[in-house]
Amino acid sequence: MQWQGRSVRKSTGGRYSPSRGKRRREIGSAPAETHIGIDRRKISRTYGGNNKVRALRCEYAAISNAKTGETKKVKIETVEENAANPNYVRRNLLTRGAIIRTELGRARITSRPGQHGVINAVLIE
């Protein structure tokens, strides 16, 4: 868990005098870091008492073909590119914008697996 409030330091290096301490609502959560594997999800309580489904491992993606308008459930083979971080390719981490190789071909992930709990993608080729 990480505190995500305003920094104690100014841009000049001086300190702000805080009017109050840190609050629990300002704490963020660790990234889900979704891998390729047998489906595993985690439900976490969020602000307002709602639930958020985090995908920890995913085996399949819902791939949409823009030309035909069809959507199919397809097995993910590997991660080919990831603009977020080059190390994510080596670790096979699934994030939004990552290019994955599937049985149908290459696809770009459009959903946020760590926030939505599912993987939706659009076919590139």
Swiss-Prot record:
Protein name: Small ribosomal subunit protein eS8
Pfam families per the UniProt record, alphabetical: Ribosomal_S8e
Keywords on record: Ribonucleoprotein, Ribosomal protein
Disulfide bonds: none
Ranges for region Disordered: 1-34
Record text on subunit structure and interactions: Part of the 30S ribosomal subunit.
Recorded family membership: Belongs to the eukaryotic ribosomal protein eS8 family.
GO cellular component: ribonucleoprotein complex; ribosome
Taxonomic source organism: Methanospirillum hungatei JF-1 (strain ATCC 27890 / DSM 864 / NBRC 100397 / JF-1)
Single biological process term from Gene Ontology: translation
Annotated gene: rps8e
Alphabetized Gene3D superfamilies for the sequence: 3.10.290.70
